[in-house]
Amino acid sequence: MITIAVDCMGGDHGPRVTLPACRHFLDRHADAQLLLVGRPESLGAFSHQRAKTVAASEVVSMDDPLEVALRRKKDSSMRVAIQQVKDGAAQAAVSAGNTAALMAISRYLLKTLDGIDRPAIAGQIPNAKGEATTVLDMGANVDCSAEHLLQFAMMGSALVSVLNGKDSPSVGLLNIGEEAIKGNEVIKKAGELLRSASKAGDLNFYGNVEGNDIFKGTADIVVCDGFVGNVALKASEGLATMIVDFLKMEFSRSIFTKFAAIAAYPIISALKKRMDHRRYNGGALLGLRGLVFKSHGSADELAFEYALTRAYDAARNNLLDRVQARIAHAAPLWGASGRSVPSGAAVPV
């Protein structure tokens, strides 16, 4: 039985979204059980034989500064959910709450894996191959060293191997051009480290990739700093929404275009489904001594259910053990521990 702790109070909508999503998830996964963390008065109406309520009296808001979330709200639903993972009561935690707070609390309670300096958020962006490109970091670290980018590549490779079933996923380094001579000093050095790791058989380095390659599916994994990754994520979601809106606008211009819309409905429906970012919700916080997944704060029921499913798949397929094994084997490439740079603030996802 896979047990997931759910921060039911987090996000823009709280229990109005998380509870229905939890019910849908349980209906589809007979070997899963949920620990619903939150204020009892907000969760009291929910009843399921494979769900248990865990009381938490406080809520971390989307605007709470780190000091408040980490030091003052010690009985927040977010913190209590992560505590379940630390205590072994759950194999993974899921929250749609404040990203910076989630990362800080997760690092404080779970600690980072040996050989990892900074956890990273790994998310998915749909591509032209009908799959998804895994991008990391997506907002945890706005400044990264070359060693950090190598660590991200190692962790991302383990993630895609486990969740996508690819034995040797390709890794691309996001750059302003494909040539090795392009990019700043951090990117150039990261390229050297990734090529060395690839020659040693520790990962499958494709080479430098550009922004459009994310959507082409040129590489299974794209590594970058959290600032760039977060911008790419939000840009892709905005583009998908704009395309759908444009189609609606054009097909509603006249009686003739409305008839055309009826004829084209199956194609439009399939396109909309492939571009639906809700199906790719759920970013993994990689590099921790426990599994934590971040849902979009604005997630609806379907999106939050997908985040729960990704956490379930990760726990069922022993993602944490796979990441630990890969890092332990490859850590000598960056001297056992990546060299640190001044810590960057998290970018809310």
Swiss-Prot record:
Record keywords, A-Z: Cytoplasm, Lipid biosynthesis, Lipid metabolism, Phospholipid biosynthesis, Phospholipid metabolism, Transferase
Domain of life: Bacteria
An annotated GO BP: fatty acid biosynthetic process
Cellular component terms (Gene Ontology): cytoplasm
Annotated metabolic or biological route of this protein: Lipid metabolism; phospholipid metabolism
Cytoplasm is among the record's keywords: yes
Gene3D superfamilies membership: Isopropylmalate Dehydrogenase (3.40.718.10)
InterPro entries per UniProt: FA_synthesis, Phospholipid_synth_PlsX-like
A Pfam short name: FA_synthesis
EC top class named in words: transferase
EC number(s) per entry: 2.3.1.274
Family membership: Belongs to the PlsX family.
Subunit structure comment from the entry: Homodimer. Probably interacts with PlsY.
Entry protein name: Phosphate acyltransferase
Organism of derivation: Albidiferax ferrireducens (strain ATCC BAA-621 / DSM 15236 / T118) (Rhodoferax ferrireducens)
Lineage, uppermost ranks: Bacteria, Pseudomonadati, Pseudomonadota, Betaproteobacteria, Burkholderiales
Gene from which the chain derives: plsX
